[in-house]
């Protein structure tokens, strides 16, 4: 005989408003709680308020050119 499972659903915090979001197929905007929070986050990336750290871009002032290769 098996015991009935009473597992709690996996939840995550909405990256924008920190509300709890159940992680399943019925949460269409996951990890966001709503379309509004999803669009706020998208706008922050588009305005470059958020970024992924990395090496700085090379520019012409760095002495780089295609002729060196």
Swiss-Prot record:
Zinc among keywords: yes
Binding site for Zn(2+): 14, 17, 33, 37
InterPro entries reported in the protein's UniProt record: DNA_gyrase_inhibitor_YacG, Znf_NHR/GATA
Keyword rRNA-binding: no
Region span, Disordered: 46-69
GO biological process: regulation of DNA-templated transcription
Pfam families: YacG
Keyword set, alphabetical order: Metal-binding, Zinc
Cofactor, how bound (note): Binds 1 zinc ion.
Gene3D superfamilies hit by this protein: Erythroid Transcription Factor GATA-1, subunit A
Cofactor section: Zn(2+)
Annotated GO MF terms: DNA topoisomerase type II (double strand cut, ATP-hydrolyzing) inhibitor activity; zinc ion binding
Bias-annotated ranges (Acidic residues): 59-69
Family affiliation: Belongs to the DNA gyrase inhibitor YacG family.
Cited function: Inhibits all the catalytic activities of DNA gyrase by preventing its interaction with DNA. Acts by binding directly to the C-terminal domain of GyrB, which probably disrupts DNA binding by the gyrase.
Quaternary structure annotation from Swiss-Prot or TrEMBL: Interacts with GyrB.
Protein name: DNA gyrase inhibitor YacG
Species: Aliivibrio fischeri (strain ATCC 700601 / ES114) (Vibrio fischeri)
Lineage: Bacteria, Pseudomonadati, Pseudomonadota, Gammaproteobacteria, Vibrionales
